[in-house]
Amino acid sequence: MEPNINNTPKRIKKKDLILESAISIFSQHGFHNAKLEQITKSLNLTDKSIYYYFNSKGDLFIEVILSIQTKLDKLIETINKMDVNHLEKIKTYTNKAMTINGLTLLMQLPKSLSDFAKYDLIKANEANHYKIWTTWFKKGQADGSMIHGNPDEHRSFLFGSLFYLHQWYAIKDNESYAQIQPFIEKMIDRMYSTNFQRLQ
C-alpha cells in the first residue's frame, strides 16, 4: 500500500526534511538501532507521522540511500564535463563525495531489506557508480595519469579506506572534511599518480 501523500510543495518539503533527519540519525546509530522518534524529534513530528510519507522504517532507509545515490549521480555528471585528466577526476570525485552526509550508509545496506521493491534499483545504481569509477581509472591508465593494476581492486581498497576515515572523522560537510582533505589528496597521488611514482 502506498503512503497517503499528495505531492503538494508543503508535503514534499516535509518529506525532504524527514529524509535529511533520517540520514543523520541512521548515520549515527545504524539502521537497526535508529528509532523513528529520534528522526522526528527535531521536526516536531510524532514517530507515527512518518507512515504518512513512508510505508515503514525500511522504506525510509531505502529512500535515504536513493537520495544519497542521486547526489552522487549529479556529482558524476559534473565531473564528466571537466576538461582534466582522469586522475584529477577521481580526486575531485573523492573530495566532493566525502562531504555528502550519510555517505557511509551506502556500505551498510542491510540484507534484510533485499525484499523491498527498490532494493534492486539501489544495487543497480551501485554497480553503475562502480562501473563509472572503473572507466575513469582505465582511461587514466590510457592517458598516462594513472598507474597500472586492476581497477576493481584499487577501487575496493580506496573505498574501504575512505569508509573508515569518514567514520573516524565524523565527516558531514565541507567544513569537517577540509581538515583532512590535503591528506586524502596526497594519499590518492601516492596510490595512483604515475607522475608521483616517477618522482620517487
Predicted regions: what they are:
Residues 1-2, 92, 131-142, 160-161, ...:
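C-terminal peripheral helix-coil segments that are non-catalytic and often amphipathic
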Residues 2, 17, 25-59, 63:
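Helix-turn-helix
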Residues 87-91, 123-126, 142-159, 175-179:
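All-alpha amphipathic helical-bundle segments outside canonical DNA-binding/catalytic cores
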Residues 28-32, 82, 143:
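Short coil/turn segments at alpha/beta junctions that flank glycine-rich nucleotide-binding fingerprints
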Residues 14-22, 39, 64-68, 72, ...:
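Generic hydrophobic, amphipathic alpha-helix propensity
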Residues 21-25, 100:
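Short amphipathic alpha-helical elements of helix-turn-helix/winged-helix folds
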Residues 98-135, 142-145:
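Short secondary-structure transition hinges
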Residues 63, 74-103, 155-158, 196-200:
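Hydrophobic alpha-helical connector segments
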